[in-house]
């Protein structure tokens, strides 16, 4: 039995000064899926991500999440509902320790509901942080200042920060950008592990990553959906090969 549709866009679009950056995208995401969104530069991938995350307000269309249309809902409210986006450029507090970075995110999640209650539950917050550190493989570096981490570990930390918000859907923008091959392999393993309890959407240019971890792939071109399918289907799609894949 197929998993339930957890997120769906209907005729989603946004214009910038008359330019259609995203143009009528219909997108259906199933619970527990790893979905890759690919396409050439300027295809609208990051803009589409920003629409899903609430960073941009669509010009047209709908975004349905758990039975509610969230199109145009501000980013902080969408995050609270369970859709969290990481960034293409690492976004951490460099002067804080690894532990403090994640704890800050976890505390903000708690204080959205009960500011003073957070202090009574500080032990639970710390337990949550330690659990996340173990999940992302940074337990032994919890006291290290974030600025002193390797680039790859900084990206893992950013994923940890997003996990502290208790996401249902995790949007990862170029999660392996700038990583060494070894770091990329570890990140692929981490994403696959996280997908056992989360639904994950990634924008990624490294096709070895896309082929290696995706359950399903959406290809955007000129802001519109060019093709969707499993990795083998996309590999063998003539339109995709012509527009994007080339020699991949």
Question: Where on the chain are the PLM-derived regions?
Answer:
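Glycine-rich phosphate-binding loops of nucleotide-dependent enzymes
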Residues: 2-248
């Amino acid at each position: 039995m197929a998993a339930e549709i957890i997120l769906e866009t209907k005729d989603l679009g946004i214009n910038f000064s008359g330019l259609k950056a995203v143009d009528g995208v219909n997108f259906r995401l199933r619970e527990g899926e790893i979905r890759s969104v690919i396409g050439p530069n300027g295809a609208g991938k990051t803009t589409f991500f920003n629409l899903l995350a609430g960073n941009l307000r669509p010009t047209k269309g709908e975004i349905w999440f758990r039975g509610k249309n969230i199109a145009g809902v501000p980013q902080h409210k969408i995050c609270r509902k369970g859709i969290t986006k990481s960034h293409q450029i690492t976004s951490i507090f460099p002067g804080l320790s690894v532990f403090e970075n994640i704890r800050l995110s976890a505390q903000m999640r708690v204080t959205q509901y009960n500011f003073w209650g957070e202090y009574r539950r500080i032990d639970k917050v710390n337990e949550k942080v330690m659990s996340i550190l173990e999940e992302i493989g940074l337990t032994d570096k919890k006291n290290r200042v974030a600025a002193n981490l390797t680039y790859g570990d900084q990206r893992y930390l950013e994923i940890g920060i997003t996990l502290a918000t208790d996401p249902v859907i995790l949007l990862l923008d170029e999660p392996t950008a700038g990583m060494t091959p070894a770091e990329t392999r570890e990140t692929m393993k981490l994403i696959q592990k996280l997908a056992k309890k989360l639904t994950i959407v990634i924008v990624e240019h490294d096709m070895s990553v896309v082929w290696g971890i995706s359950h399903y792939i959406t290809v955007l071109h000129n802001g519109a959906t060019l093709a969707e399918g499993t990795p083998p289907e996309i590999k063998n799609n003539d339109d995709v090969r012509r527009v994007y894949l080339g020699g991949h």
